[in-house]
A protein has these predicted regions:
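N-terminal secretory signal peptides that target proteins for export/translocation
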Residues: 1-3
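Bacterial N-terminal signal peptides
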Residues: 8-18
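Hydrophobic small-molecule pocket/channel-lining residues, especially in calycin-type beta-barrels
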Residues: 22-184
């Protein structure tokens, strides 16, 4: 019984000491919040439609819902997209795009980071660059010579995005395009 009481006292003391040390950590989020405010125009619920290439000459139409939320007191954005289209053989509605991204600002590098994850199990990191009308980011294939580049332009409540593919970083082919409207 004494050992349990001693263990409980030690555990409680450890929690008090560690909790106090955690609470004393300085808040360094100011520069991050300030930089992330530049992306406030993106926050909202968005719906629309578009097309993507599924192979040579195989253009597929889709509808999409994108949710962009400010999280952790404005330190990050959570971006979640769900795109649905029709199966070419059966005509049944299928999910073709289900992705999640976390956008943050790295004050040491003075750069925005785009960390993404897809339903296919892929993930990656990219620098997100602000442009005059929106933003862009580029993904480089691991172990393969290819690049994907995405551009988003937002004017008022309209989000226009297109993606491009390149094997050499010089010649680009448009592989997807979508236009969304802010619904919330």
């Amino acid at each position: 019984m004494r050992q349990r009481a001693l263990a409980s006292v030690l555990c409680f003391t450890f929690m008090l000491v560690c909790g106090g040390a955690w609470a004393q950590r300085p808040d360094t989020s100011g520069p991050q919040r300030e930089a992330m405010q530049k992306l406030d125009f993106w926050v909202g619920e968005w719906e629309g439609s578009g097309w993507s290439m599924r192979g040579p000459g195989q253009r597929a139409e889709f509808t999409v819902h994108e949710s962009v939320q400010s999280k952790l007191g404005g330190v990050v954005l959570l971006v979640q997209g769900l795109g649905k289209g029709k199966d070419a053989t059966t005509g049944a509605e299928t999910v073709g795009h289900d992705a999640l991204a976390v956008v943050s600002f790295d004050p040491k590098a003075a750069a925005y980071r785009f960390h993404h994850y897809t339903m296919q199990g892929t993930s990656g990191d990219a620098d997100l660059v602000l442009t005059d009308k929106g933003m862009q980011w580029e993904l480089v294939g691991e172990g393969q010579a290819f690049r994907m580049r995405f551009h988003i332009e937002i004017q008022g409540d309209t989000w226009h995005e297109y993606g491009e593919f390149s094997r050499d970083g010089q010649t680009w082919t448009r592989t997807m395009e979508m236009t969304l409207q802010r619904v919330k």
